Swiss-Prot record:
Name of the protein: Serine hydroxymethyltransferase
Lineage: Bacteria, Pseudomonadati, Pseudomonadota, Alphaproteobacteria, Hyphomicrobiales
HAMAP family, sorted: SHMT (MF_00051)
EC number: 2.1.2.1
Organism from which the protein derives: Brucella anthropi (strain ATCC 49188 / DSM 6882 / CCUG 24695 / JCM 21032 / LMG 3331 / NBRC 15819 / NCTC 12168 / Alc 37) (Ochrobactrum anthropi)
Coiled-coil ranges per UniProt: none
Gene3D superfamilies linked to this entry: Aspartate Aminotransferase, domain 1 (3.90.1150.10), Type I PLP-dependent aspartate aminotransferase-like (Major domain) (3.40.640.10)
Subcellular location(s) per record: Cytoplasm
One Pfam family cited in the UniProt record for this chain: SHMT
Name of the gene encoding the protein in the UniProt record: glyA
Length: 439
């Protein structure tokens, strides 16, 4: 090879290994930079979102993304896995310690895939299972007819009572006795009250069903000791690793049953997934280590305290909260007292730099893409450092936008009110910088 060719080769290699994202792909760099600006200057109230630590970001963006590792620690189908084995073993042991369980599978890539893995392990196509109705706060993977869970299985949905919007446990028991499901799924994405895991297990045992708990939304609160744990009661628990747990986006499956654990492991790999995302598993391990620290318990307590403060402030400003309040990190806000829809409210609040999502309320007369409510959550704001005082202010700002929207009575909203609130929001977020950023 000539000296010129060798120099060119070395230069190319130097660029590949050392050039920055900004140098290589300015378009993607720009989109990421703009998203960072959005996160810094907006109040994040989407209940399923949170903010990870710099340590989690560093782990997830590491060279572990290069490594294929099909199988499980000590039983891989590829060589060179001795260090990623350490990573996954740490994630497993930390998860077990965090939730007090005997077995943990940390490989699921998402919440949907973790639930699919349990179905694959414990059910056959056509089997009957019960889950919370989507309109009562359930999830697509809990039996929605548009989801695989609703297409492959016979789904019997339970819901909340019409008068108080609390889980109707009498209905759960009646439906279980009538339909003899093979599995009962408890947990949801928009239910703001404490779940009675013990009662669910009693019903499951009575009809000979597995009890599966999807605690994706409340896992951080369970880990922090401010919500009862389902682990002692359920045959199997699933959870995402983001949301209130404050880790990278992904899933996890927990159980105390060795036979179920074996079935779960086979269902995840090779049944559902191939090579696990080792860089994400590293991020999970870091997040679990953070959640095992004493300060995480204070974080979880603050999440709930902040949610209650926000709910009470909204009520004092004339809004209704589904079920009357919250015991966890989220609430459903009934917008009908302000003559607003979820679609309009989400857009108006977004223009004021307050991010949330439209959400159906129980027995909602509006269409799913319109809705009568919005779902609000406090995990991200609490991570940022907001306390009760700030969430009361946020509640007042939300009411201000909705009152302006009511006066405008149009999709365009009230520009003057929204701009005034936006300025207040930016003043608030500037006091609570993210990732070392000031101003």
């Amino acid at each position: 090879m000539s000296q010129a060719n060798a120099a060119a080769k070395n230069a190319s290699s130097d660029v590949f290994f050392n050039a920055s994202l900004e140098d290589i792909d300015s378009e993607i760099f720009g989109a990421i930079r703009n998203e960072l600006g959005r996160q810094r200057h907006e109040i994040e109230l989407i209940a399923s979102e949170n903010i990870v630590s710099r340590a989690v970001l560093e782990a997830q963006g590491s060279i572990l993304t290069n490594k294929y590792a099909e199988g499980y620690p000590g039983k891989r189908y590829y060589g060179g896995c001795q260090y990623v084995d350490v990573v996954e073993e740490l994630a497993i042991e930390r998860a077990k310690k965090l939730f007090g369980c005997e077995f943990a599978n940390v490989q699921p890539n998402s919440g949907s895939q973790m639930n699919q893995a349990v179905f694959l392990a414990l059910l056959q196509p056509g089997d009957t299972f019960m889950g919370l109705d989507l309109n009562s706060g359930g999830h697509l993977t809990h039996g929605s007819p548009v989801n695989m869970s609703g297409k492959w299985f016979n789904v019997v949905s339970y819901g909340v009572r019409k008068d108080d919007h609390l889980l109707d446990m009498d209905e759960v028991a009646r439906l279980a006795r009538e339909n003899k499901p093979k599995l009962i799924l408890a947990g949801g994405t928009a239910y703001s009250r404490v779940w009675d895991w013990k009662r669910f297990r009693e019903i499951a045992d009575e009809v000979g069903a597995y009890l599966m708990v999807d605690m994706a939304h409340i896992a951080g609160l369970v880990a922090g000791g401010v919500h009862p744990s389902p682990v002692p009661h359920a045959h199997v628990c699933t959870t995402t690793t983001h949301k209130s747990l404050r880790g990278p986006r992904g899933g996890m499956i927990l159980t105390n049953d060795a036979d179920i654990a074996k079935k779960i492991n086979s269902a995840v790999f090779p049944g559902l997934q191939g090579g696990p995302l080792m860089h994400v598993i590293a991020g999970k391990a870091v997040a679990f280590a953070e959640a095992l620290k004493p300060e995480f318990k204070l974080y979880a307590k603050n999440v709930v305290d902040n949610a209650r403060a926000l709910a009470e402030e909204l009520k004092s400003n004339g809004l209704d909260i589904v079920s009357g309040g919250t015991d966890n990190h989220l609430m459903l806000v009934d917008l009908r007292p302000k003559n607003a829809t979820g679609k309009r409210a989400e857009a108006a609040l977004g223009r004021a730099n307050i991010t949330c999502n439209k959400n159906g309320i129980p027995f909602d007369p509006e269409k799913p893409f319109v809705t009568s409510g919005v779902r609000l959550g406090t995990p991200a704001g609490t991570t940022r450092g907001f306390g009760v005082t700030e969430f009361k202010e946020i509640g007042s700002l939300i009411a201000e936008v909705l009152d302006g929207l009511k006066v405008a009575n149009s999709d365009e909203g009230n520009a003057a009110v929204e701009q005034a609130v936006k300025e207040k929001v930016m003043a608030l977020t500037d006091r609570f910088p993210m990732y070392g950023y000031q101003g």
